[in-house]
Amino acid sequence: MITTFKKALTRVNSRAWLAKFFEPVSQTSRSFHPHQTIEEADFYSTGGFHPVSLGDTFNSGTYKVVRKLGYGQYSTVWLARDSKVQRYVALKILRADCYGGSHDIFEREILSKLSTISGKSNHEGRHYVLPLLDQFKHEGPNGQHICFVFDVLGHHLDFQTAKYENGRLPIKVVRTIARQLLLGLDFLHEECRIIHTDLKPTNILLELENPEKTIEKYLSEVPARVSNECGITKPLREVIRTPLISKMREPHIRIVDFGVASWSDNHLSDVIQSPALRAPEVTIGAHWDAKVDIWSLGCLIIEFVQGIVPFSGLASKNGSWTVDDDRLARTIEILGNFPPELLRKGNRTAEFFNTDGGLLRISDLSSTSLERLIDGAERPFVKPNDMSDAEIPVFIDFLRGMLTIDPTHRKSAAELLQHEWLRM
């Protein structure tokens, strides 16, 4: 877990200066607490999760459940054996209420579109998005469930960063990850017309270098675990061991989880992204597009390089400002004021800003910059040891292309792929 950097506040309920107060990456997670050992029993009710036991089979006996990989807001995920092709797969079983209700998600349609386009496209980015292998419906006591089948992957990047000092990945690795993510996003945005809307470390997974051998070894060494509560199988977080990314011959990431993804011209929701990775236009209720994924990526690159989450927010203890207020303040402190034309487009602007463009509830802003976050005088902002002085301005320019408050001036994935920093 990324270290929390805190210093004493100068007075009760005062705002800590951004350069002295950053939150851990856990602040970016969803509200359902995915790091709980086991999901709550009431998730297994009408319209909810399907109860699964080890050994259960699905799709006319094709898939046999071997272990549990975990769960999320809309699904449980299981390690299963495909009896037809004799290989291990990840079986994702959606909640029954994901479809057939008043507000269906788009995941099934989006994954189908990804599969169709991937089969026809020559775009390099298709290799960095997790493909759908199969899908089917399953009838259970809580309703009808859509089920997806995927390749089994290794660790997510949140787990990987925790293995490095101060949560900092080697610059060479970050460069590789950045390029692969940009290729994946360009494929999604331009060829598929899909916006992920939830790009974060736990949705970026590493491929296994030898899947069948690695999984067999794990299963032989680690016994299955079952909860004593309600007979629900415990999730096995990080079920498949993965080497350090810096020691992998050719690290290969995959963007996963399209459960809250949207079409470019049809949005699932206007409340998107993990809070600390949320684009400014989303917070103020302005129109958003594929550039929200680019903003999230910029935040992640800083996180991977420096081990900090730059735009996390905290509410005041006495209620004088909200998490959103604080996050907007940090954005202004690092990147400057919001353009008036963007503020005019937000249907929530009046909740946060006065008519002069200043924040309503926070006035003690302390100006800083991207440069000071990457090449500052104190930890955690000191320059990475493996980044040269000459590289600093090039890297800052790369970040600035992603972390621009006005989304119309934010660069696209295709434009960022041409940046000099990726070739250094």
Feature roles, as predicted:
Residues 189-207, 211-246:
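Catalytic-loop of the protein kinase fold
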Residues 65-73, 77:
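Protein kinase glycine-rich loop
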Residues 293:
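Conserved catalytic-loop aspartate of Hanks-type protein kinases
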Residues 54-56, 76-96:
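Glycine-rich ATP phosphate-binding loop
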